[in-house]
């Protein structure tokens, strides 16, 4: 067996609770399996997107900007644009209509959609403006449902496919952040 990591964790992920020590480990039937696993782990470290991203100058992070908030550099943004064009082209072939929606919405939008009760703990805190509470958008579907509900539709128009490669924001705990794989700012469709 091998101890792979030691870290701290709050009981039930609540900062008000006691800090516990978390120990991660792996076990194998024999030494050969352990060595094969260690070799695979080393190969995975060499392929880690954070290492490759830094070496190829694709993206960067900086604590001054904020943890979990990656910035794409010119080399990475070229790849980003090519992927986005490819995805949008495939969606257009399948009848998707592309839209653009705001990065914020009212708390009431998320309460109406039913997302508030399930996702508010993973949302950035609400901002108060002119007597209304707004949040950074954690997902696209509530905005898209408002576009759908904007006018009546015949069953003959169905299905209506709405696409948007949108910037979304979730308040992920710092222990779960991992380069562009898991961040507090990301794009999804």
Regions found by a protein language model. Give the residues of each.
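A short glycine-rich beta-alpha junction/loop motif
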Residues: 185-187
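Auxiliary tRNA-acceptor-end handling modules of aminoacyl-tRNA synthetases
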Residues: 1-177, 181
